[in-house]
């Protein structure tokens, strides 16, 4: 059962009830929680585009608590984060793993945060193939190309040499918030929201 809290606001014109995500959107906050698939990506992309059209001078806050998911869905979010004019601040609470950590790192440099007990995990993309040998070969080439593309972006976003990224993403690589800061995945570990601009 998916329970979404409702917030009631009072105004001179009476009461208005919002689901919690709509209320957060009024404050330019987008929640990315759970596995990243096409539906989640479409929702996040629509919210990014809406907030940017509303005011491209104000920052957008993307809160992440995700185990990762689809590479293509995640890259669609990544491209949209770069496409919008507004700066996108990223904040991990809980976990940012796999594509979740990739999107955390995609935030505006200087505005990528983690709460003290957050976990961040990077690794290479996962995939599988079946069918004729030629189809398997095509799929294998595609996942190797995808790995190279993701590693190149991570190297650029973290400042780490590509060889270090390749080594460190070869297996699941878990980091604390402090370790993620030292690595360059985030810019600050924050205790409270006063660090946000």
UniProtKB/Swiss-Prot annotation:
<dbReference type="Pfam" id="PF00574">
    <property type="entry name" value="CLP_protease"/>
</dbReference>
<dbReference type="InterPro" id="IPR033135">
    <property type="entry name" value="ClpP_His_AS"/>
</dbReference>
<dbReference type="GO" id="GO:0005737">
    <property type="term" value="C:cytoplasm"/>
</dbReference>
<keyword id="KW-0963">Cytoplasm</keyword>
<comment type="similarity">
    <text>Belongs to the peptidase S14 family.</text>
</comment>
<dbReference type="GO" id="GO:0009368">
    <property type="term" value="C:endopeptidase Clp complex"/>
</dbReference>
<dbReference type="GO" id="GO:0051117">
    <property type="term" value="F:ATPase binding"/>
</dbReference>
<keyword id="KW-0378">Hydrolase</keyword>
<dbReference type="InterPro" id="IPR001907">
    <property type="entry name" value="ClpP"/>
</dbReference>
<dbReference type="GO" id="GO:0004176">
    <property type="term" value="F:ATP-dependent peptidase activity"/>
</dbReference>
<comment type="subunit">
    <text>Fourteen ClpP subunits assemble into 2 heptameric rings which stack back to back to give a disk-like structure with a central cavity, resembling the structure of eukaryotic proteasomes.</text>
</comment>
<comment type="function">
    <text>Cleaves peptides in various proteins in a process that requires ATP hydrolysis. Has a chymotrypsin-like activity. Plays a major role in the degradation of misfolded proteins.</text>
</comment>
<feature type="active site">
    <location>
        <position position="123"/>
    </location>
</feature>
<protein>
    <recommendedName>
        <fullName>ATP-dependent Clp protease proteolytic subunit</fullName>
        <ecNumber>3.4.21.92</ecNumber>
    </recommendedName>
</protein>
<keyword id="KW-0720">Serine protease</keyword>
<dbReference type="InterPro" id="IPR018215">
    <property type="entry name" value="ClpP_Ser_AS"/>
</dbReference>
<keyword id="KW-0645">Protease</keyword>
<dbReference type="GO" id="GO:0006515">
    <property type="term" value="P:protein quality control for misfolded or incompletely synthesized proteins"/>
</dbReference>
<feature type="active site" description="Nucleophile">
    <location>
        <position position="98"/>
    </location>
</feature>
<dbReference type="InterPro" id="IPR029045">
    <property type="entry name" value="ClpP/crotonase-like_dom_sf"/>
</dbReference>
<dbReference type="InterPro" id="IPR023562">
    <property type="entry name" value="ClpP/TepA"/>
</dbReference>
<dbReference type="GO" id="GO:0004252">
    <property type="term" value="F:serine-type endopeptidase activity"/>
</dbReference>
